[in-house]
């Protein structure tokens, strides 16, 4: 499908999506698309479209998932094919100061021993990003371990990244790593990991409409929780998206 913003969305059979390229997932069934909801959370409500590709009214049929097609020029912007769609190894990111001249940020966080999920609502803006070396985002971030080699991170939110997507549109994204961004993990569905179950939401696709100063406001609410079956499950706007099977090393 051709999206009004220029993206091409492919409807891929659920069992043929990139996650099942992983040796430990080959031949397995996709995650349950109606997982048990945590106490205190509402079940699925009437879904309000929030992505540009859905404004035409088209969607993918049942049994398939919508995957944004990667363009050749997007891969060429990466430092290497291996690094495409991945963050580079980093030191400590989780800082509460804003003294850097290059990285302006604000962080709210809680520490504890046993968290089985989190929920965040984020206002969606479309700030101008000048070049491929800049980005803007709002995300929730669930981590364990230290910022050494044992960091595990699960992330989701919206981001504007000309380096990754080639434009200045805010896009719904996910990310994961199990070794502090060294060799594992990626954005969205650009490697084996995230198993998508929803046929109406495309991870990596543009969000529309967005908030305006003094005008109407738009947000996205994301819920991530761990099931008793050891799956990490994602919901956005009260609709299940998919998740990760932690038994497979994610």
For the regions a protein language model found, what residue spans apply to each?
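Exposed, interaction-prone regions of secreted/extracellular proteins
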Residues: 1-250
